[in-house]
UniProtKB/Swiss-Prot annotation:
Pathway: Cofactor biosynthesis; riboflavin biosynthesis; riboflavin from 2-hydroxy-3-oxobutyl phosphate and 5-amino-6-(D-ribitylamino)uracil: step 1/2. GO terms for molecular function: 6,7-dimethyl-8-ribityllumazine synthase activity. SUPFAM superfamilies: Lumazine synthase. Its EC number is 2.5.1.78. (2S)-2-hydroxy-3-oxobutyl phosphate binds at D72, T73, R115. It comes from Halorubrum lacusprofundi (strain ATCC 49239 / DSM 5036 / JCM 8891 / ACAM 34). This is 6,7-dimethyl-8-ribityllumazine synthase. Catalyzes the formation of 6,7-dimethyl-8-ribityllumazine by condensation of 5-amino-6-(D-ribitylamino)uracil with 3,4-dihydroxy-2-butanone 4-phosphate. This is the penultimate step in the biosynthesis of riboflavin. Pfam families: DMRL_synthase. Keywords: Riboflavin biosynthesis, Transferase. Belongs to the DMRL synthase family. The keyword Transferase applies. It catalyses: (2S)-2-hydroxy-3-oxobutyl phosphate + 5-amino-6-(D-ribitylamino)uracil = 6,7-dimethyl-8-(1-D-ribityl)lumazine + phosphate + 2 H2O + H(+). One of its GO terms (biological process) is riboflavin biosynthetic process.
Length: 134
């Protein structure tokens, strides 16, 4: 049985909470267990939480969910790029799968709501990687 850590960004929680629920359901459907869930203010804050979870002996993989919507500037692109880079670094540094279930950048809130299934995708990818790399 795969043990997961789940990181959930609260910013845009009307999107991220359903994403987290989709991740929880996917884990249950795949007979995986979420041993810990960490809530962070936004996607940009997720690498530290993912790192803390990836350090744990009882966590086989970490799934991260969040939503980055567009604004009046390119801020969403900066946040998405930095977050993806740091989450990849956590995965490599800890030798633990960390999956990127963060929708965006460059999308509206409505488009983000259409991508709630990214939460399930992140959990399923984490489970698959943990199984494959075990």
């Amino acid at each position: 049985m795969v043990s997961l850590g789940l990181v959930v960004a609260r910013f845009n929680d009307s999107v991220t909470e359903p994403m987290a629920e989709a991740a929880r359901e996917a884990a249950t459907d795949r007979d995986a267990v979420i041993v810990d869930e960490v809530s962070v203010p936004g996607a940009y804050d997720s690498p530290l939480a993912a790192d803390r979870l990836a350090r744990r002996d009882d966590v086989d993989a970490v799934a991260v969910v969040g939503a980055i919507v567009t604004g009046d500037t390119d801020h969403d692109h900066v946040i998405a790029s930095a977050t993806a880079d740091k989450l990849t670094q956590v995965s490599l540094d800890r030798d633990t799968p960390v999956t990127f279930g963060v929708s965006g950048p460059g999308m509206s809130g409505a488009e983000a709501r259409e991508r709630i299934d990214k939460g399930a995708d992140a959990a399923e990818a984490a489970i698959d990687l943990a199984d494959e790399l075990d």
